[in-house]
Design a protein with these regions (language model features):
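Short N-terminal edge-element motif at the start of the domain
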Residues: 1-32
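Contiguous surface segments at macromolecular interaction interfaces
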Residues: 31-36, 44-189
Length: 189
C-alpha cells in the first residue's frame, strides 16, 4: 500500500435519527455493514516503533494516534491530498464520507450472519474480480463473500479495471451530485 492507492473504509452501523438535537438509534433499524468512506493516499510516512524519534522529525504530526504510544515496526501514517483526479474525469476531495445508499451496503438481508457480504463484481472471483487479503475462493458461498474474522482492513488489486472503474465512478458520482441538507439545532446553555 502506498502513494496512488485508494482506501475504501467499511464498518458496522445502525441507522440513527435526530431527536431534539440528539442522535438516537432507531429502534426498528437493522444493523449492517457498509462502505462509509474513502482516502486517497498521497504520502506514506513510516513511523516505525520509535514514535519519539518520529515526533521530533515530524512535529506537525506529533499528536497523531500513530505517533504516540507503543507500535510495531510497520507503524505507518497515510496522508491524503486536498483533492485527487479520479481517472482524469472528476476532481474529488482526498478523503471523505459516502452517503448511505444501496451501492455502499455490504450486508445481505438473507445471509446467515453479518459476516456474509454482497460485494460488487470487481470483488468477486466468480465474475472475474479480485480476492481480498485474508480470503480465498472458498470464502465465496452462494454469491456472497464470507468475510474473514480477522483484520480491520483487506487489500485487493482489482483485475477487472473496467468494472472497478465503472463501479467507483458511479459511487463518486452519487457523492458529487448529492444534495447538501442542513439541519440547525439551537445551542443549549
Amino acid at each position: 500500500v502506498g502513494a496512488g492507492d485508494l482506501f475504501l473504509f467499511f464498518g458496522w452501523f445502525k441507522e440513527a435519527e435526530l431527536v431534539d438535537c440528539n442522535y438516537c438509534f432507531k429502534s426498528d433499524a437493522l444493523e449492517h455493514h457498509r462502505i462509509f468512506g474513502w482516502m486517497f493516499i498521497d504520502q506514506k510516512l513510516n513511523v516505525g516503533s520509535d514514535t519519539e524519534e518520529f515526533r521530533r522529525k515530524f512535529t506537525k504530526y506529533a499528536n497523531h494516534p500513530h505517533a504516540t504510544g507503543k507500535w510495531g515496526p510497520n507503524n505507518t501514517i497515510y496522508l491524503a491530498p486536498e483533492t485527487f483526479s479520479l481517472f482524469g474525469e472528476h476532481t474529488i476531495k482526498g478523503f471523505g464520507n459516502f452517503s448511505v445508499s444501496k451501492r455502499t451496503l455490504l450486508t445481505n438481508d438473507n445471509a446467515p450472519s453479518k459476516r456474509f457480504w454482497s460485494v460488487p463484481d470487481w470483488l468477486n472471483p466468480a465474475k472475474g474480480g479480485c480476492i481480498p487479503s485474508y480470503h480465498d475462493e472458498k470464502n465465496y458461498i452462494g454469491g456472497l463473500l464470507k468475510t474473514a474474522g480477522r483484520g480491520q482492513e483487506f487489500v485487493c488489486h482489482p483485475r477487472q479495471t473496467k468494472k472497478f472503474k465503472g463501479w467507483l465512478l458511479e459511487l463518486f458520482n452519487e457523492e458529487i451530485n448529492k444534495p447538501n441538507p442542513t439541519q440547525k439545532c439551537e445551542t443549549r446553555n
